[in-house]
């Protein structure tokens, strides 16, 4: 699963849950931790 966060910043830092994520256009996506 991937959580999606808006306001993507260069480097994709702390976009989702304070974890590194990939920037796709103006949206950033990062893996979600299911524990």
From Swiss-Prot:
<dbReference type="GO" id="GO:0090729">
    <property type="term" value="F:toxin activity"/>
</dbReference>
<keyword id="KW-1015">Disulfide bond</keyword>
<keyword id="KW-0964">Secreted</keyword>
<feature type="disulfide bond">
    <location>
        <begin position="8"/>
        <end position="21"/>
    </location>
</feature>
<feature type="disulfide bond">
    <location>
        <begin position="15"/>
        <end position="30"/>
    </location>
</feature>
<protein>
    <recommendedName>
        <fullName>Toxin CSTX-19</fullName>
    </recommendedName>
</protein>
<keyword id="KW-0800">Toxin</keyword>
<feature type="disulfide bond">
    <location>
        <begin position="3"/>
        <end position="16"/>
    </location>
</feature>
<comment type="similarity">
    <text>Belongs to the neurotoxin 02 (plectoxin) family. 07 subfamily.</text>
</comment>
<feature type="disulfide bond">
    <location>
        <begin position="23"/>
        <end position="28"/>
    </location>
</feature>
<keyword id="KW-0960">Knottin</keyword>
<dbReference type="GO" id="GO:0005576">
    <property type="term" value="C:extracellular region"/>
</dbReference>
């Amino acid at each position: 699963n991937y959580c999606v966060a808006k306001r993507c910043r260069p480097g994709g830092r702390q976009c989702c849950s304070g974890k590194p994520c990939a920037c796709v256009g103006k949206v950033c996506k990062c893996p979600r931790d299911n524990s």
